[in-house]
Amino acid sequence: MHLIAPSGASLDASSPLQGIEWLQKQGVEVLNTECVNRVEQRFAGSDAERLAEVNQLAKLSPEIAVVAMRGGYGLHRLLADIQWSAIAKAIQNGLQICGHSDFTVFQLGLLAKTGAVTLAGPMLNFDFACQGDSITPNAFMWAHFQKAINERKLDCTIQAAQPFLKKPVQGKVSGMLWGGNLTVLAGLVGTPYLPTQEQTHGGILFLEDVNEHPYRIERMLMQLLDAGVLENQSAILLGGFSAYRLYDNDRGYTLESAIEAVSKRLPGNIPVLSGLPFGHQAEKLTLPVGAQAHIQYDESGFSIQSQW
């Protein structure tokens, strides 16, 4: 496993060290560990350092899995100078690259520029470091991450009531799986780093976010709706929207209210499915961004499969 730190610096200097130690105990050789110590203002190093580290991915051995240290902010600064084609060639040769949150901007930029597949999944600090009294990475996360890395496969059934489904209440869809952090994705609308309507036509869009009040979630979803992104999909998957706070003046307005306001404006043949185990949470799937996926759904949940 080759670590990169292209976004924010660690909030707790012990977190990456704990994650590295746990991975080593599992028999994983962890490379480029020195990146976890870099600090430049709020970033994990200067722009030049972080850009060089990202572009260095093009030269890595194909049996290596690349994992980002954490999210935050920082990759937007680098987009114009990333060597997209060279990194895509390394992926074509077998390299796998994983992260989420701010890393969404790299994944969607790479998809827009080259069509290369990356993995939306765990990162070092949150997913492999101390959670509570001990280092206990989520078993579900670890199992699906290993399956993605070793078998290049996603196969999961989610049992969760589906309140946003319209009739028909069951069906099947297939399409390119893509998406990530909603705030990051919405910020790419109108830029060359968001995959085009042609690229994502009939796609399966997955979304998550953290620390965003439901009205902000609604506003960003409305932006994607008005930009033609949502109605261009064959399905929309909602992951975790966590760590927000409701206020007295919400008067019953909830995350469900926000999603329903957007959902009712979508064509009835586009299922909006919730409960995807993905986001800023311990239990998360590893999702292939840019790969074909297949979903079967009804009012009690859905299954998702992909092989890449």
Describe every region a protein language model picked out.
Residues 1-62:
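ATP/NTP phosphate-donor binding region
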Residues 196-255:
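Internal helical hairpin/lid segments
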Residues 115-184:
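Conserved anion/nucleotide-ligand pocket segment
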Residues 84-109, 117-124:
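Short, acidic/small-residue loops that bind anionic groups at enzyme active sites
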Residues 238-308:
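ATP/nucleoside-binding phosphotransfer catalytic cores, i.e., glycine-rich phosphate-binding loops
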Residues 10-16, 172-208:
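Conserved beta-alpha junction segments in alpha/beta enzyme cores
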Residues 65-76, 80-81, 100:
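N-terminal glycine-rich "phosphate-gripper" loop used for MgATP/nucleotide binding
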Residues 62-63, 88-96, 116, 233-234, ...:
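A short helix->loop->beta-strand "cap" motif at the edges of active sites that frequently abuts
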